[in-house]
A protein has these predicted regions:
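Short amphipathic alpha-helix that is part of the acyltransferase structural core
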Residues: 1-21, 115-155, 266-283
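Acyl-donor-binding surface of acyltransferase catalytic domains
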Residues: 33-34, 38-138, 254, 315
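Conserved acetyl-CoA-binding loop-helix of GNAT-fold acetyltransferases
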Residues: 63-69, 192, 202-217, 238, ...
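Conserved GNAT acetyl-CoA-binding A-motif
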Residues: 75-85, 217-229
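Conserved active-site alpha-helix within GNAT-family acetyltransferase domains
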Residues: 87-98, 207, 231-249
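Conserved catalytic-core motifs of GNAT/GCN5-like acyltransferases
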Residues: 101-111, 244-261, 320
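A conserved beta-strand-loop-helix scaffold within acyl/acetyltransferase catalytic domains
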Residues: 153-198
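Alpha-helical linker/edge segments of TPR/alpha-solenoid repeat scaffolds
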Residues: 268, 301-304, 329-356
């Protein structure tokens, strides 16, 4: 496996057959930061492309020497996108986590003709602003550091973001409550992503910021806008479709942990399925035990949670029960974990936390 120099990135472009992950083409074209590994410098036939948005593996899936070296460049927790169906069965055999699990993603596209502007007014006390990196660096606004980190990872520099990207945010005096940023661009297509502080959701802030960002993307000359999200993210799907985005493809990625973008993206039964999967996988990969507990807690299953915690205790692995208690209390504020008020859980905590309330 060889780490390509930037001047050689375009040698792998014909290996990429899928069109879902725009960041892959942004990196190949030199517009966004990223790293590319290939099985040959002169004439590559297999490649691992790492971007700020994804890791994608493409080309010939049968180069066993290349495949054996892929795990050296991926962390246990890294997600991995197969470029073709031929890679689907290969990924669990070449990833550090042999139990990595596939999940479904959505690819939406918007053209100017289909755009539906969102014109509802902002609530009193909130303002809409174009993202200004210099202003954010000098401000003390809550969430500004998160935005700056994302922009740095995606674009590398303020100058490149100004040239190719855009974004809008909604804020009050002290807090940025929602923001939509362009993640990457390639030729006449740009991809955008949305985030709203969980304390301020269901207020229309995301739609307002997204609508403004879309208009600015078209004003900059882009012809199409990409919107990618997990298949379970109902909120993101609703906003995209309200603005006129059209679903053009469903595709798969692989993950070591539940692929959620919001706490309630998965139902209790879906969380339970993840708990079962992680419980079985943890017999080989012990580091998945904590993820297993988190999944069973979110599935609202007290008995399974206690059983797993008891098994961990018997292995002489320490757990911070007070942290779990406080985390569950926080989840209950989102109408989750209602069963964790039952006597069985309270008694279990009493046994493991001195003087627990």
């Amino acid at each position: 496996m060889f780490k390509l120099e930037r001047k050689d990135y375009k040698k792998v472009i014909n290996l990429v057959k899928s069109q879902d992950e725009l960041s892959v083409f942004s990196v190949i074209n030199g517009e966004n930061p990223g790293t590319i590994y290939a099985n040959n410098i002169i004439n590559p036939t297999a490649a691992l492309i790492k971007t700020s948005e994804c890791n994608l593996i493409a080309g010939n899936p049968n180069d066993e020497v290349f495949n054996s070296q892929v795990s050296e460049e991926l962390d246990f927790w890294d997600q991995l996108v197969p470029d073709s169906l031929e890679w689907m069965d290969k990924i669990p055999t070449i990833h550090k986590n042999n139990f990595i699990r596939k999940y479904k993603r959505r690819h939406y596209v918007l053209s100017n003709d289909n755009f539906v502007d969102y014109t509802d007014p902002l609530k009193i006390g909130y303002i809409l602003e174009k993202v200004n990196i210099s202003f954010l660096k000098e401000s003390s606004l809550e969430n500004s550091e998160i935005i700056l980190e994302v922009l740095s990872e995606n674009w590398g520099s303020e100058e490149i973001f100004k040239k190719h990207g855009t974004g809008y945010l909604v804020r009050n005096d002290k807090i940025i409550v929602s923001w939509v940023l362009s993640d990457c661009s390639f030729e006449k297509t740009i991809a955008i992503g949305i985030h709203t502080d969980k304390r301020y959701r269901r207020n229309g802030f995301g739609k307002i910021a997204a609508s403004a960002t879309v208009k600015d993307c078209f004003a900059k000359g882009y012809k199409k806008i990409d919107w990618l999200c997990v298949d379970s993210n109902k909120g993101s799907i609703a906003i995209a479709e309200k603005l006129g985005f059209k679903l053009i493809n469903l595709y798969y990625s692989f993950t070591s942990y539940p692929p959620i973008e919001n706490l309630k993206d998965l139902s209790e039964s879906e969380w339970y399925q993840w708990g079962e999967y992680l419980e079985e996988a943890s017999k080989t990969e012990e580091c998945l035990l904590l993820e297993c507990i988190y999944a069973y807690i979110k599935s609202n299953d007290v008995e399974k949670t206690i059983n797993i915690m008891t098994n961990i205790k018997q292995k002489n692995i320490e757990l911070d029960y007070l942290t779990f208690k406080n985390w569950i209390i926080n989840l209950q504020s989102y109408d989750m974990c209602s069963n964790f008020t039952k006597k069985a859980w309270i008694n279990f905590l009493n046994e493991n936390i001195p003087n627990v309330d």
